[in-house]
Amino acid sequence: NKKISCVKKDGTRFSQEYDKVILATGSKQIMLDIPGNNLANIFSIKNFPNAKEIFKALDDSTIKKVGIIGAGYIGVEIAEAIRKRGKEVYLFDVADRVLSTYYDRSFSDKVEEILSKNGIHLCLSESPKKYLGRKKIEKIVTTSGTQYSMDMVVQAIGFLSNSPIGEKELLRDVSGAYLTNEYQQTNIKDIYAIGDCATTFFTSINRSSVDFSISNALRTAYIATQHINNQDFTPSGSQFTNGFSIFNYNFYAAGLNLKTARLLSESIDYIEIE
């Protein structure tokens, strides 16, 4: 009696029997619900088609000032790419430093130094309160009360798991992702979940959490398919490993940074090696 109820785009309904199911429904972008969010030249970026749309818009010679909302990996990397197109770039984040969830301050200070050296304006400890303009974006008003003239905005704030299937049957974690075990099985053993829509086991914290990355999507897909094919293996778990490059500098990290670790435990010891 294992069936999936489906609805086609034209509204037609049908049922499909299954032996195993893999949910790979991905994630959806967090959008700012503020006045002016519907103005032209305000973009979001999650995938390659979004990036193509943004870079096509940059061909407009009247676009000179671009605001990037969110100083995580995507925000920092898109800021670099747009700066290399000759635009004046402003990078906003509510935190007091860039990449605050990934790196300790000594590393993020270095990233900020590189960004500033290459002409990117850092607007930290502030975020947009509203967007102003007649038809197109003209100004960003931030939580600090400052107004920035702007010709274009790219929102790179973050993601939420897209997990609408099995609302009553499948368990979620606090973030809304499908809760899975070390083999990516949900609470219904023949239904697996992988990638952005699912949790995965992290050795750093000894529990499951969400990792919105391509490498995690590939890794969890491998784990699920190996288990479905009855391969004898034990997943090693993830270690929050990540990396990125800006202006010919490469940065890598594995495990938790000090800020995140202190949220999980009050007694944290650490050393710095240079």
Q: What is the meaning of each model-derived region?
A:
Residues 1-8, 16, 84-180, 269:
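A Rossmann-like FAD-binding core segment of flavoenzymes
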Residues 20-85, 121, 174-175, 180-182:
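Glycine-rich dinucleotide-binding loop and its adjacent helix/turn
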Residues 23-24, 142, 155, 193:
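Redox-cofactor binding/interface segments in oxidoreductases and associated redox assembly factors
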Residues 38-62, 147-223:
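FAD-site-proximal beta/loop scaffold in flavoenzymes
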Residues 200-274:
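Mid-to-C-terminal Rossmann-like scaffold of FAD/NAD(P)H-dependent oxidoreductases
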